[in-house]
Swiss-Prot record:
Cross-referenced SMART domains: WD40
Organism: Aspergillus niger (strain ATCC MYA-4892 / CBS 513.88 / FGSC A1513)
Superkingdom classification of source: Eukaryota
Self-association and partners: Interacts with creB.
Protein name, per record: Probable catabolite repression protein creC
A Gene Ontology BP annotation from the UniProt entry: carbon catabolite repression of transcription
Length: 591
């Protein structure tokens, strides 16, 4: 009896990718290329200071799936099986020639805080000889035999391009599906990546550059993946190291990752299981066991059993031979993003449970918990002076919070779908007026201007508003007493309302949701649909505004020639990013 052999596996993109053999014949490797276009007269942004003109649209090529990846079938739209974690295109920008951003004074006038882990001698860095080159990862990513990395493609004239370029030019690192690209945005052929890394199955979800260690011969990049693995990558030498390999410390996806300000080695990663983990790029990993018996963990326990922060390993632990350096459990739901304050003391964390948590991460304490109207919060950023926090979320709103007053300032209404990224424009901020932008799944870019004087609280329920103000003052007085108590003893507030909110063992203030009738509303100064797919990332440069989208469009608008405020001298790489995980609900024309 004649039996036919089974058919070969079918992939989404047949024979488009994968070096190998088919029916005895070699299969060529087909690469997809980035495309750049220069639209003329389209999609300009009109603001009070002038017109922002679209310079170019760089479309990153989406890589085909790896041959070992199972074919993507049409799923049941009603299925409740969670989709694999992914992310739209995010950018990490760096200018080698620019000076490092200096810390700004804190809101209480004390100045920049000490560095994370300074009080622990076990974290003291070994002495380094002056003039010695910075340490690089050990493994060559081009010659790697790891199954985690599929291929690495370098430009044929990469060395010449790096030697001939202007050090003040802008490098960009971008993720798109399982590809990670290193781009030179100052080159004439900016669409040609210097290096493209293709991972086997994992998608890089978030990445960051260490501004402290950058030089003409060294750039430290960390990237967190959907598999939970973290890559420390040095592109100049093409060396890399794999941290949290196979999820030995935390096996859930990395949702956000940032270098800790002022540190050469430490970075913080948010995981999808609600944990914040601090890693050291030069330490080995070890199977993690919680240190629940530590004094720090006991300190954060409240008598009501509601602990806003469970310290599974403290930065003050003497056991610092392996990763993690510190590990905190905030919730059982996903941490979507976090941001460090300019004074290097506070940490703003947003979660899928709809909460904004403000931490003093040097003391490992949660100070405030705010709530959205409904749905999760997706993105967060700080004002350049550290006085305000801006968040965006699934309630289609952008919200401004005041750190000194510890309250909501205004709700910003203008998006028609989830807000995926927010960022301040430091070149258009001064002592009184602030400019920030937001993008969302409605394909819109919005610009906002606000000052405290221009915000007016609605007149209804004035008596209740006065009562609420007195409660906030009482809460603020309690926090000030708590901060002044260096011995760690917490005093009970005299206010009965405050006592119901927290107790002597819990310094956290849980703020109730402020009703809409008592919240100021702020309209945008500009609203524009800038593409056909959701926008995932927003960044402000000294000469431009940049966005990136779910399908890989990186758009750049030139600023008007006049009207740039030079009061601030921050690093050119000021950006914000967050995962946008929804399609546009509706689209409207520009306002």
């Amino acid at each position: 009896m004649f039996v036919l052999p089974p058919p070969p596996p079918r992939y989404t993109v047949p024979v488009a990718y994968a070096a190998g053999a088919s029916n005895g014949m070699a299969v060529p490797v087909v690469e997809t290329n980035n495309i750049i276009s220069h639209p003329e007269g389209g999609c300009s942004l009109q603001a009070g200071e002038g017109t922002y003109l679209l310079r170019d649209d760089l479309h990153l090529a989406t890589p085909p799936p790896h041959p070992s990846e199972a074919p993507v079938m049409n799923p049941n739209p009603l299925a409740t099986v969670p989709a694999p974690p992914t992310s739209g295109v995010k950018l990490s920008l760096v200018s080698i020639g620019s000076r490092i951003k200096t810390p700004t004074p804190s809101v209480d006038g004390v100045g920049a805080a000490s560095l994370f882990g300074d009080g622990n001698p076990a974290l003291a860095a070994p002495p380094v000889k002056e003039g010695l080159k910075r340490r690089k990862p050990k493994n060559n990513i081009i010659k790697s035999s790891s199954s985690f990395v599929s291929r690495v493609i370098t430009h044929e004239t990469a060395t010449k391009r790096l030697n001939d370029r202007n050090p003040d030019g802008l490098f960009a690192f971008a993720n798109i599906n399982r590809a990670f690209q290193w781009l030179d945005l100052s080159a004439k052929q900016k669409e040609e990546p210097v290096t493209k890394i293709l991972f086997t199955k994992a998608h890089m979800i978030s990445h960051d550059i260490n501004e402290l260690t950058k030089s003409t011969s060294h750039i430290d990049v960390v990237m967190g993946s959907s598999a939970g693995d973290i890559i420390w990558y040095e592109p100049m030498s093409q060396k890399y190291a794999r941290i949290n390999k196979n999820g030995v410390v935390n096996n859930s996806p990395v949702t956000h990752i940032k270098w800790i300000p002022g540190s050469e080695n430490l970075f913080m990663a948010a995981h999808a299981n609600g944990q914040l983990v601090v890693y050291d790029k030069e330490k080995e990993d070890a199977l993690f066991a919680p240190e629940l018996g530590s004094p720090s963990a006991e300190t954060m326990k409240s008598s009501s059993g509601r602990s806003p922060l469970q310290i599974l390993k403290s930065v003050n632990s003497r056991n610092q031979k392996t990763n993690p350096v510190a590990l905190w459990k905030l919730a059982n739901q996903k941490i979507t993003q976090f941001a460090f304050s300019p004074d290097r003391r506070h940490l703003a964390v947003v979660l899928e449970d709809g909460s904004l948590r403000v931490m003093d991460y040097l003391k490992e304490e949660v100070l405030d918990i705010f709530r959205s109207y409904y749905g999760g919060l997706i993105c967060v950023c700080w004002s350049p002076d550290g006085k305000y926090i801006v968040t965006g979320g699934q309630d289609d709103l952008v919200t401004i919070w005041s750190l000194p007053e510890r309250k909501i300032v205004a709700r910003c209404q203008g998006h028609n779908s989830w807000v995926s990224a927010v960022a301040f424009d430091p070149w258009r901020c001064d002592d009184r007026t602030y400019r920030f932008g937001s993008v969302g799944d409605d394909c819109r870019l919005l610009l906002w201007d606000f000052s405290v004087g221009m915000l007016h609280r609605p007149r209804v329920h004035q008596a209740n508003a006065r009562q609420r103000t007195s409660m906030i003052v009482s809460n603020t007085q309690h926090l000030n007493r708590h901060r002044a108590d260096s011995g760690g003893n917490r005093t009970r507030s005299d206010s009965q309302e405050t006592a119901d909110t927290y107790n002597s063992y819990d310094p956290t203030v849980r703020h109730p949701v402020e009703p809409r009738a008592r919240t100021a509303l702020l309209p945008p100064i500009m609203s524009k649909i800038v593409g056909e797919d959701p926008i995932c990332w927003l960044g402000f440069q000294e000469d431009s505004i940049m966005t990136s989208s779910l399908e890989g469009h990186i758009r750049t608008w030139d600023r008007p020639r006049e009207g740039i405020n030079d009061n601030y001298s921050y690093s050119p790489a000021i950006s914000a990013s967050a995962t946008g995980s929804g399609r546009a609900d509706s689209m409207m024309g520009s306002l």
